Amino acid sequence: MRLLTASVAIIAVLATVSARPAGFDFHALTESSGRPADSRGAGDGHALQEMLGGSQGPQRWRQAPKLTILVSVMEYEQGGDVEYLATDERLSDADIAELVRDLTDGLAVLTANTFEQFSSVSREIVAAGATVRVSRPDQIVAGRFNGLRRSVKTLGFGGRRARKDGTITAGAILLDSEFDRTSASRRLLRTHELGHALGYNHVHSRTSIMNPRIGVEPNDFDRAAALIAFRVPAFVASR
């Protein structure tokens, strides 16, 4: 496979990029411009470096994370990091079931079936006005947030915290409440933000689920990249 061959040449480059030890690394997804990324760009090797490299170096979970669903809709405040206030709105049982299903399906695809399930799935109801941290050891915390689209022009944020060796220790998925509640494209949003929580960065040079604008399903490139990130021994051992 051409992409697997290209990966051998850039594994060493990715492994030498210094990791950022502190802070939660969030990435945003915006609405589609109607112009998909150019699949002919600099080649799959360059796109792979965008997706798996970056200033932090390659990052991944070493074991299946726990998934925590915030039943309470949270209030997004611009400039916030990992603490947010709960509203009195709640996700329905059907909303939660769909969200868990989409994230579980995405987990399998984006880890090349290394993790087919989260190690556990839990729900959390937060009293209105109470503060919640979305950065928690060994967990990916996911929920709907009021005001993301309105205040910062984004559909969602996905992020993670990692140690210097590239091991991800916490992840978070912040979904714009209105978009996630009403859009037929919400599964793409959820999958994209999960990708960030799993260690992936934005891809600009070709079409990918990790493009910074919403629009495409996981494709052959994404599946091959997941195989490299989670299954290729040389890459896994590079951190």
Task: Specify the residue positions occupied by each region the protein language model found.
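Positively charged n-region of N-terminal signal peptides that target proteins for export
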Residues: 1-5, 100
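A generic secondary-structure signal marking the coil-to-beta-strand transition
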Residues: 63-65, 130, 171, 206
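Active-site recognition of the HExxH zinc-binding catalytic motif
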Residues: 188-200
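Metzincin-family zinc-dependent endopeptidase catalytic domain
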Residues: 97-191
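Disordered inhibitory propeptide/activation segment of secreted metzincin zinc metalloprotease zymogens
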Residues: 16-95, 107, 155-165, 236
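Bacterial N-terminal signal peptides
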Residues: 6-15
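Metalloprotease/metallohydrolase-associated module, dominated by Zn2+-dependent proteases
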Residues: 20-25, 157-185, 201-239
